[in-house]
Regions:
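Membrane-proximal intracellular helices of multi-pass ion channels
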Residues: 2-282
């Protein structure tokens, strides 16, 4: 089963590279495979020096590869679960982005459907919020895909620089949710919110986000003279997107004070919760 997961990723990577080559976006198949693997693994690295000149179809495909890779190949689960029976538990362990201590529901197939349903619902909700906040539908769809996957591909050369505070806060909230253990989101979705909130992992995750946000906010306000409102928004946005390895940027934080940069560096390694779409050590 572990071999099946590995072979599936390889096959998806090789096939997913074809749109880049067939559309002429990339001349090299090797570059196309790199871009696809970067998307499916939500790494976020790219071979494109600029992306704004790319056709909408290619931009959408880039974002879609990250969204598909964000929760693993749950579609594959839905197809294989009935045939694999109890063996599917081991497949989920091989594919899931974090440790699984127990089954969320008695049947693994039902678990996969529920988790994927939560993933889709949050993605659609973010699309709607971003559209209301002023983004075009195309931009809202692409950034919702890559936010929930914590991948960070953007359709803009400058990522999300120049975005309104409303857009930044929406991205911040959904990046935070994407960094939460999906088993806790499952509990919340099934009416067990109090049980989810009692999770020690969630408390530590939230404490780190809030604490680092406040520290960076104070640092920006005192050392860099950034206005209070702007410092709060920038600090929260970069803290969450960096910790969850979403990787969006609205400012050049390389110019921030040393303390801020060191704090963000540590967060990159920390990552979000186990069982989330985020990267890092979790």
């Amino acid at each position: 089963l572990f071999r099946s997961v590995a072979l599936s990723w390889i096959a998806l990577s090789l096939m997913g590279a074809l749109p880049y080559v067939l559309t002429g976006a990339l001349d090299s198949y090797v570059d196309a495979v790199f871009e696809t693997v970067s998307g499916l693994t939500t790494t976020g690295s790219t071979v494109f020096p600029e992306v704004e000149h790319l056709p909408y179809s290619v931009l959408l495909w880039r974002s879609l590869t990250q969204w598909m890779g964000g929760m693993g190949v749950l579609v594959l689960f839905l197809a294989l679960m009935p045939k694999l029976g109890d063996g599917a538990v081991y497949l989920m362990r091989a594919e899931s982005p974090g440790p699984i201590k127990s089954k969320l529901v008695p049947k693994v197939g039902s678990t996969a459907k529920i988790l994927y349903g939560i993933y889709v619902a949050l993605t659609v909700l973010e699309m709607a919020c971003l559209r209301i906040a002023g983004l075009s539908w195309f931009s809202a769809v692409n950034h919702a895909f890559t936010t929930m996957a914590t991948g960070g591909f953007s359709i803009n050369n400058t990522s999300l620089a120049g975005s309104s505070p409303a857009v930044m806060w929406i991205i911040t909230v959904f990046s935070f949710l994407a960094g939460v253990n999906f088993s806790l989101l499952f509990l919340a979705a099934t009416g067990k919110l109090r049980t989810a909130l009692r999770s020690e992992e969630l408390r530590v995750y939230t404490t780190i986000v809030v604490s680092v946000t406040l520290l960076i906010c104070v640092c920006l306000r005192v050392q860099a003279g950034v206005p209070l409102g702007e410092s709060v928004t920038d600090a929260a946005f970069q803290t969450v997107t960096i910790m969850t390895t979403t990787g969006f940027a609205t400012v050049d934080f390389a110019l921030w004070p040393t303390f801020c940069r060191m704090a963000l560096l540590v967060l990159m390694f920390t990552g979000g919760c186990a069982g989330s779409t985020s990267g890092g050590m979790k």
